[in-house]
Amino acid sequence: MSQRFNFDPSFLQPDSIEKATIIQKELANRICLEDEFNTPEFFGGMDVSNNLFDPKQIIYATAILLDSKMLSVQFHNSVSQRQTFPYIPGFLGFREAPALIDALESLPKLPDMIFVDGQGISHPRRLGIASHIGVLVNIPTIGVAKNILFGEPKKDLGSCVGDYVFLYAYGKEIGALVRTKLRCKPLIISTGHRVSLRTAIEYVLNCVKGYRLPEPTRQAHLAANAFRKQSQAGN
């Protein structure tokens, strides 16, 4: 499947939910929860656009590359793929990661850190899509999700931009609710791979430019939607 990345493609192609669960547990054991990277020169952003009711089950995936200082988009690449794995909460990586990794692989340069639209370890089996991708491609990743999938905060979140509270499960920190824009719902930030939670929060807040989403996932979201609309208009 991949020329740049050395991983077993079966980690993305389970033939049953039971096998998918086993894969998630195996990959979760490989996650690094500490900072294991040099200062990033380029950020990556990943998101998909699709219609769950599309009978063709086509997914439109985008990976972008941004300059880490100016947060300007340097390159972007989008791919479309027909999906065979069903939409099941908690198993998003098997549905979306294959297309996202293909989009990432075709960038002229790989990012030093990737912001993924979705959960990292804030997941029932500690392997959301950000962690799934991070472990397979071995690039530091951060999960940037819009809704809580797993875990609960122990206190209320403040109303100021930059406020955050941790999410807990089984007595451990697994993520954080982070206020990135006034009068907007917080984001759920979590470690994907090779980035600690507190560092992930810091990088997300540094990448916010007046919007709810940090620029890497915001720009990927815009590009994925534009690609889907353009592709569907041509059919």
UniProtKB/Swiss-Prot annotation:
GO terms for molecular function: deoxyribonuclease V activity; magnesium ion binding; RNA endonuclease activity, producing 5'-phosphomonoesters; single-stranded RNA binding. Its EC number is 3.1.21.7. Pfam families: Endonuclease_5 (PF04493). Keywords: Cytoplasm, DNA damage, DNA repair, Endonuclease, Hydrolase, Magnesium, Metal-binding, Nuclease. Its cofactor is Mg(2+). Gene3D superfamilies: archaeoglobus fulgidus dsm 4304 superfamily. It is an enzyme of class 3 (hydrolase). It catalyses: Endonucleolytic cleavage at apurinic or apyrimidinic sites to products with a 5'-phosphate. DNA repair enzyme involved in the repair of deaminated bases. Selectively cleaves double-stranded DNA at the second phosphodiester bond 3' to a deoxyinosine leaving behind the intact lesion on the nicked DNA. HAMAP family: Endonuclease_5 (MF_00801). Belongs to the endonuclease V family. This is Endonuclease V. It comes from Protochlamydia amoebophila (strain UWE25).
